[in-house]
Each structure stands twice: as structure tokens, then as C-alpha cells.
């Protein structure tokens, strides 16, 4: 089937921001102006289309990335129809995984900032994720109608805090209550939106006299940024002193896609001003799937191969999100990088080595859906009923295999025990937890062998609270939840140059014999686990070496200090012996496990605890109290900045163990006037007194 929209007119964009910057409202306005919604949804009354889970509507925050397709012909109807796939991503730190996954499959992003709050901690996290995947982006400064709004302050923060290179393409007319529109620096005209039509109509006018000087100054910066795109344009600019509109747009597009600049706009989504111009900027400056480099992957032999965004290429796609839908069951969201996917096709999953048959294909609009027959290169859609595909896996042509780069998911830092309230809940709970863990790779479920309890782990208290809540609402499982527990780790600080493990059993008939000698060394943080085979002369036969590795790996989940997972250790197998008759895989696994445990004891084992980056915004009067309290929680205060309009931002690194219940405590310390955000930073060695307490508590 021929394309309705050429690939050059596709835009796959994410809308990303700090919590409360007004991102979901911005998305709602996009859906309204592109004609998808005929009634405006508001986050604060729980009617926003993109926030479709019950918890999201109650809490007024976005938890899962909803994917929506919209169409845009330009604010003045002056463009051919463009197809925009929008992914709305959450702004709460506990849901960073959602942002990470959407960044992996997007071509461009709109970063939304609050004109009052500016660049906040989560803005920095999101910016880092966009850098990691090389996503070109625009900046949209929202809430220009709020008291304390300051477009130019946010411009400065983008430069200093994010090391961005923002290029304003509009500047505000008025501020706070008197914000009425923007000066378009490309056209050098004022844009005033009509309030009666909820911003669907607008007028170009002359730039207000009092803004002419400012507009000329920023126009100059805009033209300079455009001229820097090529020597040819720079010469033209130096000769004529200016550039025309087409030159500017082509140059800004080129530099935005290269990641050199970020066009910057402003408005107030809630008051229906500015989002329309931002949509035009999405078309003008953000890439189509054809503008980005071909996607990298590997063939079956591990050789690098590429696929371009072309319908004629062999099919390849990445599954980037799983979701349970109450009506159609399991949905797998896929980004098609090359070729065409049709319902009824059989495709290949190279990670599992399995074939999958494609059932129905759906184009999603928040939680409404439209059935489609095929998905073309560059598009995003949901597949119904894939049996064995998890987040981050590749789907490809059955005869032309490619494995796309997998996504990286963070390790959980907090755990809780969950127990079903009744026998009936017991059976349903296992199913509910495995379904939720399949959807969310940053959520883990395991059984504690000693206590028999089910332990759930995630990225923060809110993350686990919402998952338990979903278990109740979506699966009808009532559960009791234990106190949050810190996800400690264990490692070693010294080498153990030689440690022996010997497993010998003689009980008549065939016995067991395994004998290994290992060397253990600490790895740098984040090194994980490494196994080296340094056997010479066949003292341990080839076929038993994988069993040694496996024996060590099976020991890693429970360390010798307090039974926490062991990380950052290198084990080298360099000697051993075997018996012609009695040796087998199991005997070598047991010997390796014994040697590793003993080696850990000799190599100065230590307990590691998760450290959190905490940022508190507080009125100045309470700054001293807040800092004192953070220090009493074993926190290291790393700095304090002024907030424009009064108040202080305090940055600190604090152990997670000391942060439980902090929200309540901070409220009482500051009479409810301070707010904070917290995200995982790294693991660090726990002080001896803390480690002793944790070890003693686990030993009870």
C-alpha cells in the first residue's frame, strides 16, 4: 500500500520535562490543535487524554508513556500534512526508565521547562538521557503567565546547568498576567493568539515599540547561529548583513539535527498560547526518520550491519514498551526502523531465537485505538498478542537477521516484602507481579529463600506504591506491604591470590570429585562480574570450565556478609585437578562455589549502600535547618544555589537508608514550604557501624 504521508513528513518526538512543568497539558494542547481532541483535557481535573491510568488521573502525574499519532498542517495551514508520533513521558524520577525507553526510539524531543522553576533536577536527568541517545531537541518554556515567569532566566540556566546551546526563535510579549503572545524572530512579526477560539486562530502584527530593541538584539543572535551552519551562509551574512527566512530555517534545521543548537520557544499551554508555534518548529527543525543515520545492529555472527529508514529494506524493529490493555490484552509498542510490518507476518526475535506471528496492529491515541493493516519504516505502533517479547528486544525479517542495540535498564535500589491478604489473592499475585515485571524492566520480583516472602524491588517508594496499587486495581489482588528495605550490595577490597575449593564425595559406586584454585580481585565500581579462564595444560578439562563459572555465578546473589548480591569481582581460574571417573559438572560447580565464598572472606569483604543525589528547594529561613538535618542523615552537602525570586536550592548526597520518611520530616521542618527530589547516584562503602548493624539484623 502506498504511503499517505512521505517519510520526510514524519516526526517521532518525545515530550519530556520535570514534574509539574506542564508537559501533559502541553501534549493535550498539541492533540487539540492537531484536531485529535475536540475538548481540552486538563491535568488538574483528571480529564487529560494522555494520562489514562486511574492512578495518573488521581495523582495528576504521568506514569507511563502513552504514544499518540497526530497530524499538522502548520499554524497558518501553510505546510503539507505532517504526521507526528508523540510519546508523552513521565517527569517523576522514579519513572526515569520510561524516559530512557522512549529516548531510545525517538528522533527528536521537546523539552518543556517551567518559566518560574526553570531547569530542575529531573530536567538534568532527561537532558543526559537525550545526550546519550543523541536526540535533537527543542526547548519550550511553559507557564509564561505565572507569577515569577522569566524566559531569559531559563535561557541562562539552559546554558549553565545543562551546557546547552539554546537559540531563541521567539521572545515573549509581556510576562505573567500581561503575557499576550510572542515575537517571531524568524519572521520579525508579533504573533497574538485569539482567546475566544482557544488559540486556534491568530494574527501577525507589528512588534510592540518597547520590544523593538530587544527583538533586534535576539534576531541578530538567531541569524548568527544560522550563519554558522556553513561557510557559504557566513559569507552571505557578512556581505549582506542578514539572511532570508528560508536560509535561516534550513540552517537552523541542519544545526539542530546535528545537535549543535536547540531552538527555544515559549508560551502558556494552559492559556492556549505558544504551543501552535512550537508545533511549527517541530516540523521546521526536528528530523524525520530519513534525516537520522541508519540504525546500527549486528548479524548472527556479530558483524556490524546497518538498516535505513526505507520501506524497501528488510524489516527491523525494536520493542520498546509492553502494556496490558483491559480490552485487548498484552500490547507491545514497536518502532519500525526499516521495511514494513503487516498483520499476519511471521517475524524473528534474535535474542530469544524464536519466531513470532504478528496478530492485530494498532495505532494508539492515548488509550483509544485504531486497527491498521501495516506499519511502515519510521512509524510507531502497538502489536497485539506477541507471546515472548520483552522490552528492548529486536524483531526482524525471518530471512535477514539483525540484532539492534539493547537498552540499558537501571538496577533497583529499594525493596519491599509483599504478602497476599488471602489464599485467593495468593494465586493471582504471582501472575500480577510477573505481568508487571514484564512491562517494567526496572521492577524486579524474587522469592526470599530463607523467609519464603515475595520481595519486590524498584526505583523508589512511589514506584513500588504505584505498582502495588496497580496490582489491586488491574488484577484484583489485595496485598500487605512490608517496610521499604535498602538494596545493599557486597564486594571485596583486596586481592585473594590463591583460594582452593575441593568437593569430594565417596559413597560406594561412582563418587564426586571437583577441585579448583581461584584468584579473586576487586573490579572498579560498575564492573559487575568477570570470569577468566587461565588454565594451562588441561589440569581442569575444557568441558568443566563453564561449570566453574556457573558455580561462582550461582553464589553471587547471596554474599557472605549479609546475604546481599556480590558485585565488582573478577575471578580467575588458574589451577585445579580432576578424576577420570568421579569428576562431573556438579562437582566442579560445588568446588567453585566453596572456593569463591572462602576467597570473599579473605579479600576484605565490605557492604555497599546506595547513595542518592538529593536536591531540596526551601525558603531561605529554613536553609540552615534543612542542611543540618541532611548532615544528621549522614549526608554530604555539596552546594547551595540561590533561587530567583527567593529561596535556596541545596544539593547533597545522602544514603538511601537515611531517606525513608523524609517527605514527612521535611514538611514539618519547613511548615510544608520546601520540596525535594531524589535520584540514585552510585553505590558507596557503608561505614563500619552501619554495616555491623545491617549484618547483625540480617543474622537474626
From Swiss-Prot:
Coiled coil: none
Source species: Bordetella pertussis (strain Tohama I / ATCC BAA-589 / NCTC 13251)
Boundaries of every tr-type G domain copy: 8-290
Keywords: Cytoplasm, Elongation factor, GTP-binding, Nucleotide-binding, Protein biosynthesis
Biological process according to GO: ribosome disassembly
Name of the protein this chain belongs to: Elongation factor G
Gene this chain is encoded by: fusA
Superkingdom of this protein's organism: Bacteria
Functional description taken from the UniProt entry: Catalyzes the GTP-dependent ribosomal translocation step during translation elongation. During this step, the ribosome changes from the pre-translocational (PRE) to the post-translocational (POST) state as the newly formed A-site-bound peptidyl-tRNA and P-site-bound deacylated tRNA move to the P and E sites, respectively. Catalyzes the coordinated movement of the two tRNA molecules, the mRNA and conformational changes in the ribosome.
SUPFAM superfamilies associated with the record: EF-G C-terminal domain-like, P-loop containing nucleoside triphosphate hydrolases, Ribosomal protein S5 domain 2-like, Translation proteins
GO terms under cellular component: cytoplasm
Subcellular location: Cytoplasm
Binding site for GTP: 17-24, 88-92, 142-145
GO molecular function, one term: translation elongation factor activity
Amino acid at each position: 500500500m502506498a504511503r499517505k504521508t512521505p517519510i520526510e513528513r514524519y516526526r517521532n518526538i518525545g515530550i519530556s520535562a520535570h514534574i509539574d512543568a506542564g508537559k501533559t497539558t502541553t501534549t493535550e494542547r498539541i492533540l487539540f490543535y492537531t484536531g485529535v481532541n475536540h475538548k481540552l483535557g486538563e491535568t488538574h481535573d483528571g480529564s487529560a487524554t494522555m494520562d489514562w491510568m486511574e492512578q495518573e488521573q488521581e495523582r495528576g502525574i504521568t506514569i507511563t508513556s502513552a504514544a499518540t499519532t497526530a497530524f499538522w498542517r502548520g499554524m497558518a495551514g501553510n505546510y503539507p500534512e505532517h504526521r507526528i508520533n508523540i510519546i508523552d513521558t513521565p517527569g517523576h524520577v522514579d519513572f526515569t526508565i520510561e524516559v530512557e525507553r522512549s529516548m531510545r526510539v525517538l528522533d527528536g524531543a521537546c523539552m518543556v521547562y517551567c518559566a518560574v522553576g526553570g531547569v530542575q533536577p529531573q530536567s538534568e536527568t532527561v537532558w543526559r538521557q537525550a545526550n546519550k541517545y543523541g536526540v535533537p531537541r527543542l526547548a519550550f518554556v511553559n507557564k509564561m503567565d505565572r507569577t515569577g515567569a522569566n524566559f531569559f532566566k531559563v535561557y541562562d540556566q539552559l546554558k549553565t546547568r545543562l551546557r546547552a546551546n539554546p537559540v531563541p526563535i521567539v521572545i515573549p510579549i509581556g510576562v505573567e498576567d500581561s503575557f499576550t503572545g510572542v515575537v517571531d524572530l524568524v519572521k520579525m512579526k508579533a504573533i497574538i493568539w485569539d482567546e475566544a477560539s482557544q488559540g486556534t486562530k491568530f494574527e501577525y502584527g507589528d512588534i510592540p515599540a518597547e520590544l523593538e530593541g530587544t527583538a533586534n538584539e535576539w534576531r541578530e543572535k538567531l541569524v548568527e547561529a544560522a550563519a554558522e551552519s556553513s561557510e557559504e551562509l557566513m559569507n552571505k551574512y557578512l556581505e549582506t548583513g542578514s539572511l532570508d527566512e528560508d536560509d535561516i530555517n534550513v540552517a537552523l534545521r541542519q544545526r539542530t539535527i546535528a545537535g549543535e543548537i536547540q531552538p527555544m520557544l515559549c508560551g502558556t499551554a494552559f492559556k492556549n498560547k505558544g504551543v501552535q508555534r512550537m508545533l511549527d518548529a517541530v516540523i521546521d527543525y526536528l528530523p524525520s526518520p530519513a534525516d537520522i543515520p541508519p540504525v546500527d545492529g549486528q548479524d548472527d555472527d556479530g558483524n556490524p550491519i546497518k538498516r535505513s529508514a526505507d520501506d524497501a529494506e528488510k524489516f527491523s524493529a525494536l520493542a520498546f514498551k509492553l502494556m496490558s490493555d483491559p480490552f485487548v490484552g498484552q500490547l507491545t509498542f514497536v518502532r519500525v526502523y526499516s521495511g514494513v510490518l503487516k498483520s499476519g507476518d511471521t517475524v524473528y526475535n534474535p535474542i530469544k531465537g524464536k519466531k513470532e506471528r504478528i496478530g492485530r496492529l494498532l495505532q494508539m491515541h492515548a488509550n483509544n485505538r485504531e486497527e491498521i493493516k501495516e506499519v511502515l519504516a519510521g512509524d510507531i505502533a502497538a502489536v497485539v498478542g506477541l507471546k515472548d517479547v520483552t522490552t528492548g528486544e529486536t524483531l526482524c525479517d525471518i530471512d535477514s537477521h539483525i540484532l539492534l542495540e539493547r537498552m540499558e535498564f537501571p538496577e533497583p535500589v529499594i525493596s519491599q516484602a509483599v504478602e497476599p491478604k488471602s489464599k485467593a489473592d495468593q494465586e493471582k499475585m504471582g501472575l500480577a507481579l510477573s505481568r508487571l515485571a514484564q512491562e517494567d524492566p526496572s521492577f524486579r520480583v524474587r522469592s526470599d529463600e530463607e523467609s519464603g516472602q515475595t520481595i519486590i524491588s524498584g526505583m523508589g517508594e512511589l514506584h513500588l506504591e504505584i505498582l502495588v496499587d496497580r496490582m489491586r486495581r488491574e488484577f484484583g489482588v489485595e496485598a500487605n506491604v512490608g517496610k521499604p528495605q535498602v538494596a545493599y550490595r557486597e564486594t571485596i577490597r583486596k586481592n585473594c591470590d590463591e583460594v582452593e575449593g575441593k568437593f569430594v564425595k565417596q559413597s560406594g559406586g561412582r563418587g564426586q570429585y571437583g577441585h579448583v584454585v581461584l584468584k579473586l580481585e576487586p573490579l572498579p565500581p560498575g564492573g559487575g562480574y568477570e570470569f577468566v579462564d587461565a588454565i594451562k595444560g588441561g589440569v581442569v578439562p575444557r568441558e568443566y570450565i563453564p561449570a566453574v563459572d556457573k558455580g561462582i555465578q550461582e553464589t553471587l546473589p547471596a554474599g557472605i556478609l549479609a546475604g546481599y548480591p556480590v558485585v565488582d569481582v573478577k575471578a580467575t581460574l588458574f589451577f585445579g585437578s580432576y578424576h577420570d571417573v568421579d569428576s562431573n559438572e556438579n562437582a566442579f560447580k560445588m568446588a567453585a562455589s566453596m572456593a569463591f565464598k572462602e576467597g570473599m572472606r579473605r579479600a576484605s569483604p565490605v557492604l555497599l549502600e546506595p547513595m542518592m543525589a538529593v536536591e531540596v528547594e526551601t525558603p531561605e529561613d529554613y536553609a540552615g535547618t534543612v542542611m543540618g538535618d541532611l548532615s544528621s542523615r549522614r549526608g554530604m552537602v555539596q552546594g547551595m544555589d540561590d533561587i530567583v525570586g527567593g529561596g535556596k536550592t541545596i544539593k547533597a548526597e545522602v544514603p538511601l537508608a537515611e531517606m525513608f520518611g523524609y517527605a514527612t520530616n521535611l514538611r514539618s521542618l519547613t511548615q510544608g514550604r520546601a520540596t525535594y527530589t531524589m535520584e540514585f547516584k552510585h553505590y558507596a562503602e557503608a561505614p563500619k557501624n552501619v554495616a555491623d548493624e545491617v549484618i547483625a539484623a540480617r543474622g537474626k
